[in-house]
Amino acid sequence: MPGGDAAAYASAIVTDAAGRKQYVQFLDEGVVGVDAKTGEFLWRYARTSTGPANIASPIAHDSHVYSTNARRFGGGLVQLKATADGVSAEEVYFERAVPNTLGGQILLDGYLYGTNQEGLVAVEFANGKVSWQTDGGPGSVLYADGHLYVHRESGGVALVEVGPGAFRKKGSFTPPNQPDHLHGPREMAWTYPVVANGRLYIRDLGTLWCYDIRASN
């Protein structure tokens, strides 16, 4: 890798763009793409990186890749285009109000859903325009069964029905016996929710809660 980038925290993803199957990874110095067959370095987008704690995995759709370093710095979208030399990454937008925390983002029907410092936010994937913004603070998000599950950094959990122009909280609770966060902002509730086999799993540090969320007969 040019520059010898160190690894960050984000997971690699796979996309087909600009005529090539690529592995896309958010490294210490930015988002990069490499040819999946040959390992050839193709492109880099550095604006969303403040390294080394680049945490959220990128999102790829068609020829576009969205990234945020998850440190409330901002998020950016690039379009990948084939060139005579390989592949270029051309910035479409960089915005600070878009989902930009370590809790990830969900791409659904052309909109990104996630959290920023203020709370849950919906933005148009194509242009970064904010559709709506809520309060409640940052958190991690999961999409399942037509709803967002939000695990706030403060420990609370919310079930949310979302759409481009709508936000409806259908319920919320705080799991009991919360662990002590002894190191302040360096030790928040950062774990993503998990839904499997009709159960919701919430973890915070060494504590795990499991809830039956199957519909009642």
Regions picked out by a protein language model, each given a short descriptive name:
Residues 19-21, 62-63, 109-111, 145-146, ...:
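Short coil/turn segments that connect the beta-strands within blades of beta-propeller domains
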Residues 75, 155-157, 163-164, 183-217:
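Blade-level signature of beta-propeller repeat domains, shared across WD40, Kelch, NHL, RCC1
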Residues 73-75, 96-165:
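Loop/turn-rich, solvent-exposed surfaces of beta-rich toroidal or solenoidal domains
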